[in-house]
Amino acid sequence: MRRDLRTVFATVVVAVAGVLVVSTLLQGWDRALTAEGGAIELTGLAVFALGGVLVAWQMPAHAWRRWWPIPAIFVLFCLRELDVHDAFFTPGLLQTRIFTSPVPIWQKAVSALAMGGILLTLVLIVTRGIGPLGRALWQGRGWAWSVVIGVVMAIASVLVDGADRQLAAIGVTLPGAESRVWTAIEELLELGFALSLLLAVCIWDRTGWPRHGVNATRSGNKVREPQHPIP
């Protein structure tokens, strides 16, 4: 199973690289790497979507109740790539300014529910996943290190995002070309984040999903399974 998924990951990497190279040759690097709806954004969306599908496919029935936030987070990443946070309402479904804007109360309620759902997903990912992730890192599991590398890339992309605006605040103005370079770097980091998560999914052992609070019956005796076994 893992060997097949590693082949899938290698195929995805080759396909992504091919799309970016062809798009750069046809449209120029600035459009391919920085334009809204450009090649790099679309490939990132496809990678997140594939990661979510593979997680849902691999997750056994007993794990869904506790670990549903994992496929859910991939869905949220896809929605972010589609700019859903700025859609539907003015100033945007997930913009906090909506609570002080003159919009119908039901729109504020929908936004509050959406933000609450996202916050719940993130909290559950952290509180339920930090233990297994930490133990997997200690044991040198590749999927755990892939997740950490991806998170580092995501943090770096946030820091790079809007570098021109941040520098302008202290009196430094970047030429247009340099501004596009920073945008391209941000997009590449986000794509690296998506690929790192996909790699983690592809090298994760399907049999290693933690059983939380489940008793396994073996030879007529009830044996308490570890809550967080690491594959």
Q: What are these regions, as identified by a protein language model?
A:
Residues 130-152:
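Membrane-helix boundary/juxtamembrane motif in polytopic membrane proteins
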Residues 76-88, 152-165:
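C-terminal TM-helix exit segments that contain a strictly Trp-centered aromatic cap at the helix terminus
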Residues 22-32, 90, 127-129, 161-174:
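Juxtamembrane "helix-exit" motif on the non-cytosolic side of transmembrane helices
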Residues 6-21, 69, 149-152:
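Alpha-helical transmembrane segments
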Residues 14, 43-58, 110-125, 188-204:
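Hydrophobic cores of alpha-helical transmembrane segments in multi-pass inner/ER membrane proteins
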Residues 154-229:
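C-terminal transmembrane-bundle signature of multipass membrane proteins
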